[in-house]
C-alpha cells in the first residue's frame, strides 16, 4: 500500500513536469493527450492504494481486477465522501476522453491549444487550463488519499 502511494507520488512528479514544462513549451494536442494519460495513471495508483487500504482494514475481501469494478467498489466504500466520489468520476471521464481516437486539434503551438472531441453526444474542449485544473484536483486527491492512509498509520 505504501509502495503504491510512493509510485503515485513519482507519477505525480512526471505529471507536474509534463504540465508545467513540456506542455507549456510544446503546446500540442499530443502533449495534452500525454498529460491526460499520466493523470489517469496517477489516479489508477491512488485508487489502487485506497483499495489496498480497504482490504488491509477488512472493508473488502479482495481487490477487483477491472477498472469498472474498482470504480464501483470505491464508490460503494466511500459513498459518503464527496471528494473521493468527485475524483473517481473525473478519473472515469478522463479514461473515456483518452479512449477517443477522433479529435480535432486547434491553435497548436499557441497559448490556447485546444483538443475538441465528441463524448456522449456532446462537444468537449480540453485546453491547457483544463489540464491545469485536472492536475490541481489530482494533487488534492493525492494529499487526501495520503492523509487517509498515512494518517491512520500514525494513529496506531
Model-based region annotation:
Residues 1-34:
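Charged alpha-helical initiation segments
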Residues 3, 10, 37, 41, ...:
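Generic recognition of short, well-ordered alpha-helical interface segments
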Residues 6, 33, 37-40, 129-132, ...:
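A generic "alpha-helical surface" signal
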Residues 11-18, 38, 45, 137, ...:
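Amphipathic, well-ordered alpha-helical segments in soluble domains
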Residues 15-26, 49, 53-56, 119, ...:
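Secondary-structure edge/capping motif, primarily at the C-terminal ends of alpha-helices
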Residues 24-60:
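N-terminal interaction modules that seed assembly of large macromolecular complexes
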Residues 57-140:
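Long, charged low-complexity segments
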Residues 134-156:
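Long, hydrophobic alpha-helical segments that serve as membrane-spanning/inserting helices
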